[in-house]
Amino acid sequence: KYKTKSKIDPLNFFSKLSKTNLAPEAFMIRDKNYSIISCSPENLITKKGSNISTKPIAGTVKKTKYLNKIKALSYFRKNLKETKEHNMIVDMERNDLSKICKVGSVKLSKQKIVEEYKDLFHYVSLIKGKLKKNINNYEIIRAMMPGGSVIGCPKINTLNLLNNQEKENRNIYTGSFGYIKFNGDMRFNIIIRSILNFKNVSEISVASGVVVDSNANHEFNENFLKAKALIDLFK
């Protein structure tokens, strides 16, 4: 968690961020008491009619002049830690969707693809399903939140463990922001890569997935990499 005292212009920050690190789930909230500027790349729920999808991210590598999108895909496929982490999260999200979807309808639409951002590449999958009859939005949100990629597996046990281990509240971090239409369609992201400014204190939270093959130094450096686009706004 990075913190700094700063009086910021949320609209200016968001405008800069949209130009330098455009992300599909980006958003900004400006209130008289606080503001949130986000370049979140991760979609948790997209519901249109009876169709639902989730797009978990699990896997990160630094972007360099020697590492293009094709080489990044090769890196992810050969890296045992990244593969284990990704498989774990995908399995968990498929399980969450299976609670609310018709039997046999949950499918991997896109499996282990690479998405490119300003400073990094992400390892991403897209999972789709057909909702059971009479499933309401409350049941969907309850089944899908919090997102598996920011919790871990097994979900309930990990949540209990995190409650005991984490000394500070996450605030908005790893929550969700989105909308529900009058027709019931909805879209929610996962709040990562975000700045929370409250009482002229800006806060950036980052984290990484840990499995048995994880290396502490690698995970620490990955966290800084994830925060870099946001930290650069203060320069």
Predicted regions and their residues:
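Extended alpha-helical targeting/anchoring segments
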Residues: 1-235
